Amino acid sequence: MTNWNYQLTHFVTSAPDIRHLPADTGIEVAFAGRSNAGKSSALNTLTNQKNLARTSKTPGRTQLINLFEVAEGKRLVDLPGYGYAQVPEEMKIKWQRALGEYLEKRLCLKGLVVLMDIRHPLKDLDQQMIEWAVESDIQVLVLLTKADKLASGARKAQVNMVREAVLAFNGDVQVEPFSSLKKSGVDKLRQKLDSWFNEIPPQEAVEDAE
């Protein structure tokens, strides 16, 4: 199995919606989460780059789909943060529609990383994202971010509680604690990404079968 070098990840493009994304080929893994879940920090920690994904002091700032290339045909996709209170309702609905459309229609999407603050996991929209992914046969890795904010016992209890809760989705959903500050959980994230990126892209599998 190839171990991809995530430090070589670089920005490719931003798109306002799925129609403006590059060709639906290769393999993509998407990162999704509430606006303050620490998504940008996780991407920066994964790639060991301070400014790959710009961390914003204003949650809800990332309104575009941002694509980063790990290697040729292997992309990380930073989806718009969702659920921020100060964003107009109309815009929230537009984002949710775009997220749902992406998860349902993007053939090269192999995995979804859902980031949640370990202190406030499984909000409605988090569950909606997991549900959409499971319905589309997409594997999910839940990262419980800011794990350093809890003492060891409380952290374990939260992880176990979420692991128990996601069984209800009847899908392939893995749950791991993560801390950008302490760089804990990064190895688990890399292992999961490696396994997704080592799969045969959907369009190549179809060609091989013909």
Curated annotation (Swiss-Prot):
SUPFAM superfamilies (alphabetical): P-loop containing nucleoside triphosphate hydrolases (SSF52540)
Q: Which residues bind GTP?
A: 33-40, 60-64, 78-81, 145-148, 178-180
Cofactor(s) this protein cannot do without? Mg(2+)
In terms of InterPro entries, this protein maps to: G_ENGB_dom (IPR030393), GTP-bd (IPR006073), GTP-bd_ribosome_bio_YsxC (IPR019987), P-loop_NTPase (IPR027417)
Return one GO MF term.
metal ion binding
Sorted alphabetically, the Gene Ontology cellular component annotations on this record are:
cytosol
Provide the GO biological process annotations.
division septum assembly
Enumerate the spans annotated as EngB-type G domain.
25-199
The answer on whether this UniProt entry bears the keyword Lipid biosynthesis reads no
UniProt key word Acyltransferase? no
Q: Name one Pfam family in it.
A: MMR_HSR1
Q: What does this protein do?
A: Necessary for normal cell division and for the maintenance of normal septation.
Tell me what this protein is called.
Probable GTP-binding protein EngB
